[in-house]
Every structure is written in C-alpha cells, then in structure tokens.
Regions:
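Positively charged, amphipathic and often flexible ligand-engagement surfaces
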Residues: 2-399
Length: 399
C-alpha cells in the first residue's frame, strides 16, 4: 500500500460515522443497545441492577434468559465457542477479527486450572482453523494460584510444596504456549494486579525466549497507568533485540485502578500508578511510538477505547509510510463497546479485532458486573456510547 493511499484513507477516517459503526445492527438490535447504555449511563441504576441480579442468582430465580438477552448479549459472544460463531461471522463481514476470551473466573484448584487450560487450547485450535480469529488470549490466574504468583515475587519465595504446585501450573503454561507455537497462533497473556505482575512478566519473557525466535507468538501486556511501565517497555525491547527474539506487545491503559489504590492505601505503600490520567495518556502514546520505532522487532496491539490514541497511531503510520494493514500492528476493542472506533478503522483498512468474552452465563457474571461498573465509572465512556447510539437511532428515523 502506498503512502498516498494511506493519506487518503486517513482523511476519510471518522469516529463520528455511526452509519458505518452500527451497520451490522438491525433496528431492533440498535434500540436494545440504546436502552442498555441508557441504563448504564445512570450510575445508581447500574448499582441497583447489579444488586438485584446478584440477589436473583443467589435465590436461583429464573433470570438467566433476561441476562442473556441484555447485558450478556451486548458484551459476550455466547456460552461456548460454538455459540460465538454467529458473532465471529458478523464481525468478519466487517473485516474485524475475533479474539475469543474465555471469561470464566473459576475456583483456584487444579481441576479448575485443567478445565481452563483445555478451553484455552480449544481457542488456539479455533484460531488456527479460522482467519477470522487472529489471536488467542488468557490470564495467568486461570491456570495459576494467585497466592503463589504473589508469593513467588516476594523475598520469602515458595515452600517446597508450593513449588510443586507452581511448577505444575507452569507445565500448563508451557503446554499452552507450545500449542500456540505449533499452530502458529499469536497468544496474548493479559496483565493483572501489580502484586502478581512481576511473576507473570518473568514467565512471559521466558516463553518469549522459547517461542518468539521466528515471529511473535507470545505477547505480554503493558499497563501504561503504572509509573514504571514505559521504562519496562523500553527494557523489554532492548532485551528482545539483545537476545534475538521478537517482542509481542499489547498496550493498555490498565484495568485495576481502584483495586490498586485501595491495596496501596491499606498496606501503606506508594501507589504504583500515575496520579493523573494525563500522565497515563502520555505514556500510552509514548509506548505506541516506541513500538513503531522498532517495528521490525516488535509486533504490537493497542487495546484501547481512546479515540485520540487510535487517531495518533493512524497519523504516525501515515507519516512513516506504514500501510494500514501492516501485519505487526493491530487495534483491539471489547465487544459491545466503541463500535465507532472498531468499524470505522476496519472500514479504512486497518487491522482490527474485538475481544469476545464467552462462557456459561452464571460463570461470566463477575466479568459482566465489572464491565458495567467500570463503564459507569469511566468518565465520559458510557455517555459517549449512549450519544453515538442516540445519533444513529435519530439518523435512521429520518431516512
């Protein structure tokens, strides 16, 4: 793709184009999304609704169907990989990839870890078999005991018995990464809380050294709201260059803000996060630049709902003469959110994917509650979604 074509596409790129953003939604689906975000736009309604859903589930009242057609239907692909096929196909029609995200938060025991491992292996096979699924993804806490991950990065370390359990989980990790390597499937390892992240990083880089010599298979996630993360990214790039492997990077702002601040306050240590959102935004955008500057060595994905960061990346790609569909660069958003970004980027020829959570309704509820609460607490995010849906409803009325 030429520099000229890139410039032309950038000029026509608009995150305000709701006709493109919601083209795949019928009038009924559009109105349903409109009402979901109308409710989520009211913080007190989110809290009230969450309380009653938890209560009804606890009392085993028949609310599964209501949940499945509302919150679950908005943010999840289905209860199984098979149920996600319709979503995968719909996204693919718009040239948007799917990242199947098994979002079940199971118990911390070996039986649960094995079930999760087996499900992750299924998503890797599914990705290998379908060009519509460019990545697989998982969390370390799906296969590791979180207390062991935390203890591993302390001075005390693990006991002999704990070491056995830890190594068993590490075997699951190696099995997952080996399968991704064998199937040539790119694999995101999601970031988690700072008190277990050092362990996750260590394991992740060990897997990169093992599997990323031909191309980026293993991707680590960098949460740019952490004060040390930009430096960590630069260091990771340097190590990858020094040891001759490809660095897989997923850039995010960060998902555990309130949890991190609460723990820092309770345990009386300095918060590892930026005090101001502007500093997070700055580091996120500098992280994009660092990846672009080392594009031969780095494959990266920007996981963001921030329009400015997406536009900046598009602008920098144009300035450097990098084609929209460069295989080392991806954009990603969550299913059911920021369709104005995803669909308009895809329409302009950029590589885009949606995170598509799936799993049994009752098991995915903790994820959905967090999503609803996070949306209502992120300044402007829900009202932005609501305003765009409102705009498209009005546009269709006037046709």
């Amino acid at each position: 793709m030429t520099h000229q074509t890139s410039s032309k596409n950038l000029k026509k790129l608009s995150f305000e184009d709701t006709q493109i953003a919601f083209a795949s939604k019928s009038d009924f689906q559009l109105r349903k999304s409109y009402w979901i975000f109308a409710i989520m736009n009211q913080n007190w309604l989110v809290k009230l609704g969450t309380f009653f859903i938890k209560l009804f589930l606890f009392l085993h009242l028949p609310v599964k169907k209501i949940i499945k057609t509302t919150l679950f239907g908005q943010f999840c692909g289905g209860e199984s990989i098979q149920e996600c096929q319709t979503t995968i196909q719909e996204l693919d029609k718009a040239h948007i990839g799917t990242i199947l995200d098994y979002s079940v938060e199971g118990e911390e025991n070996d039986k649960s870890f094995q079930l999760t491992k087996n499900e992750i292996l299924k998503t890797i096979i599914q990705s290998h078999e379908s060009s519509a699924i460019p990545y697989a993804v998982f969390k370390m806490t799906g296969i590791f005991n979180s207390e062991l991950l935390e203890k591993y990065q302390t001075e005390k370390g693990l006991s002999e018995e704990e070491e056995i359990d830890f190594l068993k989980s590490k075997d699951y990790l190696i099995e997952i990464c080996q399968e991704a390597y064998n199937q040539e499937v790119r694999l995101f390892i999601d970031a988690e809380e700072s008190w277990i992240q050092n362990t996750i990083d260590e394991l992740c880089y060990e897997m990169m050294q093992r599997f990323n010599h031909k191309t980026s298979i293993i991707f680590n996630t960098f949460q740019m709201y952490r004060v040390d993360m930009l430096e960590n990214l630069h260091h990771a790039i340097h190590v990858a260059q020094d040891q001759s492997y490809f660095l897989g990077v997923k850039l995010v702002r960060g998902a555990y803000l309130e949890k991190e601040r609460l723990r820092a306050h309770e345990d009386e240590y300095s918060e590892p996060l930026h005090k101001e959102k502007e500093a997070t935004d700055r580091d996120f955008n500098l992280g994009i630049q660092a990846c672009l500057d080392h594009l031969e060595q780095v494959h990266f994905c920007v996981g963001t709902h921030n329009e400015q960061s997406c536009r900046l990346l598009c602008q920098w790609m144009e300035e450097k003469g990098i084609s929209q569909n460069h295989p080392h660069i991806y954009f990603a958003q969550l299913l059911g959110m920021s369709d104005n970004i995803s669909y308009n980027l895809a329409s302009s020829g950029y590589n885009v994917a949606k995170y598509v959570p799936y799993g049994p309704v009752s098991a995915v509820m903790p994820y959905l509650f967090r999503r609803a609460e996070e949306n209502s607490s992120i300044a402007g995010q829900t009202s932005r979604e609501f305003a765009l849906l409102q705009k498209e409803v009005s546009r269709r009325k006037n046709l």
